[in-house]
From Swiss-Prot:
Gene (name only): upp
Name under which the protein is recorded: Uracil phosphoribosyltransferase
Role of this protein: Catalyzes the conversion of uracil and 5-phospho-alpha-D-ribose 1-diphosphate (PRPP) to UMP and diphosphate.
Homology family: Belongs to the UPRTase family.
Protein keywords: Allosteric enzyme, Glycosyltransferase, GTP-binding, Magnesium, Nucleotide-binding, Transferase
A GO MF label: GTP binding
GO biological process: UMP salvage; uracil salvage
Binding site for uracil: I193, G198, D199, A200
Length: 208
């Protein structure tokens, strides 16, 4: 599995700000979008371009355009919605596919409850967004669903990943690509990433 920990100074700085314990909902939400935007920049670096002639201000001009890439952004509800706009900043024409999965707090197992996928998803590159890759269960279940529907080009974008989640994802889906702003130390006994960000969903939506 291709694993990219994006170590750009802007990414490191913004993620560091997100680790503040008393960060406001507004600030956390803004930073989640900004870091997702920077991860998207990295995740799309292998997109091919082609020469296209357009009408410029002084006659025809040849420019580079991305070659035939249909993209769907796949936020995992609910926290993934906090990263979606960061992707759409760069790919505004992307279709949105929504997958609802929550983690049982006792078993830590993923429980699917909703999905609405883009049409012709088998022809698209899926960019799955979720702030945290902890146990990996929700991400694996989401990718299982995408592959069942014929989507086999999948990139995963997360703010923070735990080694345990990376290992589980790689075992289940070695063909996907993972882009993360940080690989943290470990999971605690409650399945939270340490040092992590806390509950990203609560911080994005202002709930507890």
């Amino acid at each position: 599995m291709k694993i990219v920990e994006v170590k750009h100074p802007l990414v490191k700085h913004k993620l560091g700000l997100m680790r503040e314990g008393d960060i406001s909902t507004k600030r956390f939400r803004e930073l989640a979008t900004e870091v997702a935007s920077l991860l998207t920049y990295e995740a799309t670096s292998d997109f091919e371009t082609e020469k296209v002639t357009i009408e410029g201000w002084n006659g025809p001009v040849q420019v580079d355009q991305i070659k035939g890439k249909k993209v769907t952004v796949v936020p995992i509800l609910r926290a993934g919605l906090g990263m979606m706009d960061g992707v759409l900043e760069h790919i505004p024409s992307a279709r949105i596919s929504v997958v609802g999965i929550y983690r049982d707090e006792e078993t830590l197992e993923p429980v699917p409850y909703f999905n609405k996928l883009a049409t012709n998803i088998e022809e698209r590159i899926a960019m799955v967004v979720d702030p945290m890759l902890a146990t990996g269960g929700s991400m694996i279940a989401t990718i299982d669903l995408l592959k069942e529907k014929g989507c086999n080009q999948i990139k995963v974008l997360v703010l923070v990943a735990a080694p345990e989640g990376i290992a589980a994802l790689e075992k289940a889906h070695p063909d996907v690509e993972l882009y993360t702003a940080a690989i943290d130390e470990k999971l605690n006994d409650k399945g939270y990433i340490v040092p992590g960000l806390g509950d990203a969903g609560d911080k994005i939506f202002g709930t507890k």
